[in-house]
């Protein structure tokens, strides 16, 4: 079974805009798990193709971030590792880097990671 994580850690609107990407991923996956921030959780549950939702209050994306700690990092690495994903697609806006998230995913044992940073129209 091919399980793919789609990561979009922003708000509901940003998660909804990820809908076409989620559907494209779902077309080639057996299961899609959407990894979102708390402000995007409601929208993730509405998207076609999403089988499960995992909420992560990511310290470098959240508007009121928790501190970055060893324990917090180990906790999300363990949570993501337990999902047993074969692949992850990291979606960000133009002002965010996908690299910290990709590092956490690699630490969780995700073998293939694709990042698609957003682009600015200005």
Labelled PLM ranges:
Residues 1-122:
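Catalytic machinery of carbohydrate-active enzymes
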């Amino acid at each position: 079974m091919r399980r793919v994580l789609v990561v979009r850690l922003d708000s509901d609107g940003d998660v909804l805009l990820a809908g076409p990407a989620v559907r494209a991923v779902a077309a080639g996956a057996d299961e899609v798990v959407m990894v979102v921030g708390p402000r995007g959780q409601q929208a993730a549950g509405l998207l076609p193709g999403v089988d499960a939702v995992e909420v992560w209050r990511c310290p470098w994306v959240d508007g009121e971030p928790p501190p970055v700690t060893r324990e917090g990092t180990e906790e999300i690495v363990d949570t993501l590792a337990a999902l047993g994903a074969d692949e992850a697609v990291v979606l960000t806006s133009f002002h965010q880097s996908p690299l910290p998230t990709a590092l956490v995913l690699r630490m969780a044992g995700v073998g293939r990671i694709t990042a698609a940073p957003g682009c600015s129209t200005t």
